[in-house]
């Protein structure tokens, strides 16, 4: 038993885990939404318990999924870890596995960001480490190398010249990236790493096949798993707009726009499949997702309905 939990909060956590499983399913009916809202509003312990779900999702850095079919846009891996985290709060032994996992390491990392937060850190060598929303990284410098371990989320690196000429490396679950220049971003997804190079080049070694390597040059983007490289593609400048505290979209499907917003906004943001293909262009302040939703409502034939402060539906007019 967890002595910090009252019986009512323990029951609320059990109910929250049930509702999380329901709302992260493939189909969520209006009746289920209404019942969740009723449950959420009827008791402060329920609101506290749901906040624990949100906190776990924020820390775990869930990657947005199919916004048209998943209420909370969480990947299967994220859903599993959230449920384990709730077990941990309930005092169940199985939750300990979360803290022994790489995600658990991330929860104790040197640098972490919550949802909607971008953080900039100047490292001891003068390099700049920028963490995107819901990200975690450890930094280790020794006499031989400078290393950043990305546990989850996304980081941007601007390297500084090192008097000791130590290599600057980023480690992810899928491989090792060595800076051959000054500016690049790295995003940790469930089963692959996304690398975007803005200046100079980055060398990539695969975790399961270190003999294989790939050089990614400025203006290029690469996805890779632990065992194979994807195709090198031209860099999409919009993908790195967050480093300037903005979100930029150029003729993007509304479904993709909403998937991006869910990374920065707490709660449930649902997009009806009937409007997911509408296109949006614009540049918006990253910290004001309400402004983006207002533009969507004003420029596209959609209706934006606030079920609660933390639940918004986007549907056809």
UniProtKB/Swiss-Prot annotation:
Topology within the bilayer: Single-pass membrane protein
Membrane side Cytoplasmic: residue ranges: 1-81
UniProt xrefs under InterPro entries: FecR, FecR_N, Ferrdict_sens_TM
Record-annotated membrane-spanning stretches: 82-98
Induction description: Induced by hydroxyurea.
Gene Ontology CC terms, in alphabetical order: plasma membrane
Keywords, alphabetical: Cell inner membrane, Cell membrane, Ion transport, Iron, Iron transport, Membrane, Sensory transduction, Transmembrane, Transmembrane helix, Transport
Post-translational modification (record): Sequentially cleaved starting with cleavage immediately after translation to generate CL(a). CL(a) is then cleaved by an unknown protease in the periplasm to yield CL(b). Finally, CL(b) undergoes intramembrane proteolysis by RseP to produce the N-terminal cytoplasmic fragment CL(c) which is released from the membrane and binds to sigma factor FecI, allowing it to activate transcription of the fecABCDE operon.
The keyword tRNA processing is assigned to this record: no
One of the GO BP terms on file: signal transduction involved in regulation of gene expression
Membrane topology (Periplasmic): 99-317
Gene3D superfamilies in UniProt: 2.60.120.1440, 3.55.50.30
The keyword Kinase appears for this protein: no
GO molecular function: transmembrane signaling receptor activity
A matching Pfam family: FecR
Localization per Swiss-Prot or TrEMBL: Cell inner membrane
Motif Internal twin-arginine motif in this chain: 79-80
Subunit structure: Interacts (via periplasmic C-terminus) with FecA (via periplasmic N-terminus). Interacts (via cytoplasmic N-terminus) with FecI.
Reported function: Required for transcriptional activation of the fecABCDE operon by sigma factor FecI. Undergoes sequential cleavage to produce an N-terminal cytoplasmic fragment which is released from the membrane and binds to FecI, allowing it to activate transcription of the fecABCDE operon which mediates ferric citrate transport. In the absence of citrate, FecR inactivates FecI.
Name this polypeptide is given: Ferric citrate uptake sigma factor regulator FecR
Native source organism of the sequence: Escherichia coli (strain K12)
Gene that this sequence comes from: fecR
């Amino acid at each position: 038993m967890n002595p910090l939990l009252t019986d009512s909060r323990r029951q609320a956590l059990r109910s929250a885990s049930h509702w999380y499983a329901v709302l992260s399913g493939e189909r969520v009916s209006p009746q289920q939404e209404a019942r969740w809202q009723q449950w959420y509003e009827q008791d402060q312990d329920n609101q506290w318990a749901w906040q624990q779900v949100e906190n776990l999702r924020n820390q775990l850095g869930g990657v947005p999924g199919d916004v048209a079919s998943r209420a909370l846009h969480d990947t299967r891996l994220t859903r599993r870890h959230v449920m384990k985290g709730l077990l941990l709060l309930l005092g169940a032994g199985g939750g300990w596995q979360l803290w022994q996992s790489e995600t658990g390491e991330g929860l104790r990392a040197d640098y972490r960001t919550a949802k909607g937060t971008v953080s900039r850190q100047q490292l001891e060598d003068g390099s700049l480490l920028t963490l995107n929303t819901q990200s975690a990284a450890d930094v280790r410098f020794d006499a031989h190398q400078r290393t950043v371990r990305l546990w989850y989320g996304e980081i941007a690196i601007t390297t500084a010249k090192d008097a000791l000429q130590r290599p600057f490396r980023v480690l992810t679950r899928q491989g090792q990236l060595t800076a051959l220049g000054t500016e690049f971003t790295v995003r940790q997804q469930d089963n692959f790493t996304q690398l975007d190079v803005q200046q100079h080049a980055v060398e990539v070694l695969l975790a399961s096949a270190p003999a294989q390597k790939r050089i990614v040059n400025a203006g290029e983007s690469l996805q890779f798993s632990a065992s194979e490289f994807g195709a090198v593609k031209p860099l999409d400048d919009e993908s790195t707009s967050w480093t300037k505290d903005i979100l930029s979209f150029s003729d993007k499907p509304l479904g993709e726009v909403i998937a991006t917003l869910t990374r920065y906004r707490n709660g449930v943001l649902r997009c009806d499949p009937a409007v997911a293909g509408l296109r949006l262009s614009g540049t918006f302040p990253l910290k004001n997702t309400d402004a983006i939703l207002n533009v969507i409502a004003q420029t596209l034939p959609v209706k934006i309905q606030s079920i609660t402060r933390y639940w918004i539906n986007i549907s056809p007019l």
